[in-house]
Design a protein with these regions (language model features):
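Glycine-rich phosphate-binding segment of PLP-dependent enzymes
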Residues: 1-51
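PLP-dependent aspartate aminotransferase-fold enzymes
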Residues: 29-168
């Protein structure tokens, strides 16, 4: 409609979500004061604050992915190993590409509807929540099969599969 086109043609106020703000500065100062206070100093030089859980999981996945490349490429400490990921059964970490690779709760839907999923389908190892034995077995399997574990993502809320269940 003409009215929508006219409204869209005008300058729009947009949030600049990529710029730091004073809330982030306050959080950074509070973290720096609290973290490491028993050791005499905070061991971290910087903190990264993000706008959502999805952004934080995407970034964590990207960092793990970058580290995995360094370790599994030729010449790396784990060169040639197959890459695996660990998550809890029923866990949800997001719908964007890297988080969905760790999301067991939506795995079936992705496998049925996404062509790209067939390249990642067998990379996720899932463990029942609270299962120390399952976790030990996952790492034993990784050693026995010469797998490289990229990362282990935990879903402390289980909001998609089992809302209200907290993982201690």
């Amino acid at each position: 409609p003409e009215s929508v086109i006219a409204a869209m043609a005008k300058p729009q106020v947009m949030a600049n979500i990529m710029s730091p703000n004073f809330s982030q500065l306050r959080v950074s100062k509070a973290l720096r004061a609290e973290i490491g206070h028993t050791r005499g100093a905070c061991p971290y030089s910087r903190f990264l604050t993000l706008n959502s859980g999805s952004e934080s999981v995407s970034l964590a996945g990207r960092i793990a992915d970058t580290n995995t490349k360094l370790h599994t490429d030729p010449g790396g400490r784990h060169a040639g190993k197959r890459v695996k990921r660990i998550a809890m059964k029923g866990a949800f970490h997001g719908r964007t590409e890297l988080p969905c690779l760790y999301s067991d709760s939506s795995k079936k839907a992705y496998a049925e509807n996404l062509a790209s999923w067939k390249h990642h389908e067998n990379q996720l190892i899932t463990i029942e929540p609270y299962s120390i034995e399952g976790l030990k077995q996952a790492f034993a399997d990784a050693d026995a099969n010469v797998w490289y574990t990229e990362a282990m993502f935990l879903d402390p809320v289980m909001g998609e599969r089992d809302p209200g269940r907290a993982v201690p």
